[in-house]
Amino acid sequence: MKLIIFTGLVLFAIVSLIEVQADNERACLPQYQVCTDAPGNCCSNLVCNCYGRYKSGARIGRNCFCLQKGVIYKREN
């Protein structure tokens, strides 16, 4: 009985380690990629910045992109 419980715990630990490793290996989003649905997936040197979209003063949506940390983007005329 103890052997069955021990074997079950060992298998559980192995499966847990495999899942954690798979999460750590997930690809990060590179610069300028859309991160609206996954704000935490930008690569380490990037941050997910979101901007509202407006038409005639009414908000019509939101866009989020992986951009460099500390960089300010301004609209050019």
From Swiss-Prot:
Contains 4 disulfide bonds. InterPro entries: Spider_toxin_CSTX_knottin (IPR019553). It comes from the Eukaryota. This is U8-lycotoxin-Ls1g. Residues 1-20 form the signal peptide. One of its GO terms (cellular component) is extracellular region. It is found in: Secreted. Pfam families: Toxin_35. Keywords: Disulfide bond, Secreted, Signal, Toxin.
